[in-house]
Curated annotation (Swiss-Prot):
Keyword terms of this UniProt record: Cell membrane, Membrane, Transmembrane, Transmembrane helix
Subcellular location(s) per record: Cell membrane
TM helices/strands, residue ranges: 4-21, 33-55
Domain of life of the organism encoding this protein: Archaea
GO cellular component: plasma membrane
Topological relation to the membrane, as annotated: Multi-pass membrane protein
This protein's name: Uncharacterized protein AF_2291
Organism: Archaeoglobus fulgidus (strain ATCC 49558 / DSM 4304 / JCM 9628 / NBRC 100126 / VC-16)
Disulphides: none
Length: 261
């Protein structure tokens, strides 16, 4: 139990006992009652700080518990997301909130099927210090805010029930293909929800024409990739986008593939 709650409960019980003793005339004067009440408050505060020194809270353990809870809750979400509805927020437990529907590719995996990008979702949100958010996850009991500052990657974990503001510096981001290392913060998938159009931008320049889909992109999983059978594969270019339409992340279903033009 929280030490502060114990201290408050102790004072309330002590004060209640003093009131009972006064009503039973064991404490005759109000002056004596006032002095004893003040003494009880002082002793309670002293005991509270003594307890903090004698039994310090294990913040590392609490931090680990939060991380474990978050990792467990995120196992089933992979790169699943829902776009934010502007009439009301639509945020599934552990899912990613994308402000203005802008996401960022930050990690490249080289597979037998070509380059597959695990999307690290990005919003346009800037905090008071001007750092740019990379990932924001909002769950029932905790929030994760991953962001970049001066080339280093950090994340803050906030929990409603435990620690608020655990601030952790991550190891530097490693790219699987160094050819893409200069594109950090510069590759964006742009999505116009009103028209269900999606396109790719690098360094703010639109490098592909709009791609029209015959279904709503909500509840979709998006991959960027390249074809290992084409020359562009060796040069590390993205040449296609894959959209998995499924409401359940455990079953991605059949991908819809569109090439960049």
């Amino acid at each position: 139990m929280d030490t502060r709650l114990i201290a408050i409960a102790t004072f309330v019980v002590t004060f209640g006992i003093l009131i009972v003793l006064k009503r039973l005339n064991y404490i005759e004067s109000w002056d004596t009652f006032s002095i004893l009440s003040i003494l009880a408050a002082v002793l309670t505060i002293a005991a509270y700080f003594f307890t903090l020194v004698l039994f310090p809270q294990d913040y590392d353990q609490l931090k680990k518990e939060i991380l474990d809870e978050i990792n467990e809750s995120l196992k089933n979400y992979e790169i699943y997301f829902k776009c934010k509805d502007f009439k009301k927020p639509i945020v599934k437990d552990g899912a990613v909130r994308i402000d203005k529907c802008v996401v960022m590719a930050t990690k490249l995996n080289l597979t037998d099927h070509g380059y597959i990008v695990d999307l690290k979702f990005r919003s346009n949100w800037m905090d008071s210090k001007g750092t740019h958010a990379i990932l924001f996850i909002d769950g029932d009991d905790a929030q994760i805010n991953l962001f970049e500052r001066e080339g280093e990657i950090f994340y803050i974990i906030k929990s409603k029930n435990k620690i608020s503001g655990v601030y952790i510096q991550l190891k530097s981001v490693k790219w699987f293909d160094e050819a893409f290392s200069d594109n950090w913060n510069n590759i964006k998938i742009m999505w116009d929800t009103s028209k269900d159009e999606i396109w790719l931008e690098i360094n703010g320049i639109r490098v592909s024409k709009k791609l029209n889909f015959d279904f709503n992109l909500n509840d979709s999983v998006i991959y960027l990739g390249s074809n290992p059978l084409e020359d562009t594969y060796a040069e590390g270019y993205f040449d296609r986008i894959m959209v998995y339409k499924s409401a359940d992340t455990a079953d991605f279903g059949t991908p819809t593939v569109r090439r960049f033009e």
